[in-house]
Amino acid sequence: GIPCAESCVWIPCTVTALLGCSCSNKVCYN
């Protein structure tokens, strides 16, 4: 997928999750 410039190491994807991004390997991907 495409990296969404947000990490999800400590907290889940927040803002980018609204854009359809999900956590994968500690990084939010679309």
Swiss-Prot record:
InterPro entries linked: Cyclotide (IPR005535), Cyclotide_bracelet_CS (IPR012323), Cyclotide_sf (IPR036146)
Disulfide bond annotation, renumbered to this chain: C4-C21, C8-C23, C13-C28
Alphabetical GO biological process terms: defense response
Keywords per UniProt: Disulfide bond, Knottin, Plant defense
Domain of life of the organism encoding this protein: Eukaryota
PTM note: This is a cyclic peptide.
Tissue specificity note: Expressed in roots.
Cross-link named Cyclopeptide (Gly-Asn), sites: G1-N30
Entry-linked SUPFAM superfamilies: Cyclotides
Family to which this protein belongs: Belongs to the cyclotide family. Bracelet subfamily.
Free-text note regarding domains: The presence of a 'disulfide through disulfide knot' structurally defines this protein as a knottin.
Protein role: Probably participates in a plant defense mechanism.
Official protein name in the record: Root cyclotide 1
Species assigned in the record: Viola hederacea
